[in-house]
Amino acid sequence: MTATTETAPVAPPAEPAAAKKTKKQQPKKVAGGAKAKKPSGPSASELIVKAVSSSKERSGVSLAALKKALAAGGYDVDKNNSRLKLALKALVTKGTLTQVKGSGASGSFKLNKKQLETKDKAAKKKPAAPKAKKTAAGAKKAPKSPKKPKKVSAAAKSPKKVKKLAKAAKSPKKPKAVKAKKVAKSPAKKATKPKTAKSPAKAKVAKPKAAKAKKPAPKK
């Protein structure tokens, strides 16, 4: 009997562990259900803007008329009544809707045409702005191409170096011309000296004539 009483209390502690596991798993299911409830379609503000823009009433659209239009589109108005009121107030503060009558969420509402016109103009101007940026980028890229002629200018500078080398080659020619002049002057001086030596040559020519005249005398 004592053995059975000691072993019996050991089994129950396993049950609270299982209960803890079930408690942890349950909140996960609830979180998954909350995520599934989020609407995947358009927001309440978008639906209100569509309903007001589609209406042809000049005096504006009342809250009751909005609810009818949204209910006809399949929107649950009863569950999302608070969201509709908050969306209406937010649209009025932003300026997308103008409140013609009443205050708060009650009354009648119209679309703010001025803001819509500005949005349309901004939407039309936005595509034009990227084109201007592209042209500006193209204009910046265009001047980059003339950088290549710099190499040509560097090549054009090389003839200057060739000219300098040609001038350097011409400069040694000048001393050669000077040397030629000096050489030409020296033979001229030598040519003047032999003039004095010509006088004895004439005397030598005169002597043989006298010898020839002496030979015929013995023949007689």
Curated annotation (Swiss-Prot):
CDD domains to which the protein is assigned, alphabetical: H15
One GO biological process term is: nucleosome assembly
Outline the extent of the H15 domain: 40-113
SUPFAM superfamilies tied to this protein: Winged helix' DNA-binding domain (SSF46785)
What job does the chain carry out? Histones H1 are necessary for the condensation of nucleosome chains into higher-order structures.
Which protein, by its recorded name, is this? Histone H1B
Lineage of source species: Eukaryota, Metazoa, Chordata, Craniata, Vertebrata
Q: Which family does it belong to?
A: Belongs to the histone H1/H5 family.
Q: Which UniProt keywords apply?
A: Chromosome, DNA-binding, Nucleus
Q: Where are the residues of the annotated region Disordered?
A: 1-45, 99-220
Q: Which organism is it from?
A: Xenopus laevis (African clawed frog)
Q: Which GO terms describe its cellular component?
A: nucleosome; nucleus
Sequence ranges of Low complexity compositional bias: 28-45
